[in-house]
Amino acid sequence: MARVLIVPCGERGRALARELRAAGHAVRGTTRGAHVAEIAQTGAEPYVGDPDRIATLMDALHGVTIVCWLTGTIPDADLHAGRLRMLWEKLVDTPVRGVVYEGMIPEGEAIARASSQTWQIPLEVLDGDPRRETWTADAVAAVDRLLGA
């Protein structure tokens, strides 16, 4: 069993949380505040934090093995650049052993890959259309691969 942090835990994140909980993992899902009840209904622990303010996520990393950074469809360039880079820099001093990055933005994927190499934290990139039927299964498989690394 591992603890997985899902940032943010929107609709796709909650589907992933349900599957990870069913597999026996502890899951913590972040929200800016609007989806606390929906996250709790998945069996995940809700955590109020903002990916635009990395400092608000630091306490959520306690005991976390895998971070799922699911910002691929959010049209905020900073989440795929400065904030993403800052997250990786902060992960060095945590128990995190892997990151799943939703790689819809080429610049963000490049930062994630470079950061993975620099900080020696394994990375799995989810690419392709997140609306496809296999997205959740692909995300679960990415988490499983990181846990096996």
What spans do the regions from the language model cover?
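Conserved N-terminal Rossmann-fold NAD(P)-binding element of oxidoreductases
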Residues: 4-9
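A generic structural motif
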Residues: 23-27
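Aromatic pocket-lining residues of Rossmann-like dinucleotide-binding sites
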Residues: 20
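Structural motif
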Residues: 3, 65-66, 98
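NAD(P)H-binding glycine-rich loop region in Rossmannoid oxidoreductase-like domains
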Residues: 29, 34-85
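Glycine-rich phosphate/pyrophosphate-binding loop and the adjoining helix
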Residues: 129-149
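Conserved Rossmann-fold NAD(P)-dependent oxidoreductase catalytic core, especially the SDR/UDP-sugar
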Residues: 85-128
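N-terminal Rossmann-fold NAD(P) dinucleotide-binding loop
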Residues: 13-14
